[in-house]
């Protein structure tokens, strides 16, 4: 059976294409973020897996949660989380529209096809579509040691040139790499670490 990421791709593309054509890219991103956050919650996911709950009830619950917790005047935890993700100041009193009919139908379709569990992956793929459309990509760089400013600038410049897009680098450190880096952009992974090279050598020697 295909993994969740593969199953989510067509839904994410359909969602982004519709949102892009209708000038609602940011709104759909907000809707998907909250829906994905809810689905990732263990207690709620257990409820979603309950066959006794109808598909219509499940999708309606997700929509109602957004409308009452985010698109209302209430200062809820969901709204605070969305504000933080978007870089909105807590005291800005940012307002969000209610869920659109189109998004409500999208969630309903996922629910009827027993695909609500895909929402976190749909959200991630949607964000990638948005980044590509803006010519901006996220590069997740893991290195054995913290990058210096010069190394970071050089890596960012090389990635931008090879990908023909502006690149936002997200850094993490993993001492087990021994040396070098691993880079993940979308579904592509570049392993230029010493650990990776040793693993390749081991594979070649035992082949």
From Swiss-Prot:
Membrane topology: Peripheral membrane protein
InterPro entries on file: ATP_synth_OSCP/delta_N_sf, ATPase_OSCP/d_CS, ATPase_OSCP/dsu
Alphabetized GO MF terms: proton-transporting ATP synthase activity, rotational mechanism
Keyword Lyase: no
Predominant location category: membrane
Disulfide bridge positions per record: none
Family to which this protein belongs: Belongs to the ATPase delta chain family.
Entry protein name: ATP synthase subunit delta
Lineage summary: Bacteria, Pseudomonadati, Pseudomonadota, Gammaproteobacteria, Moraxellales
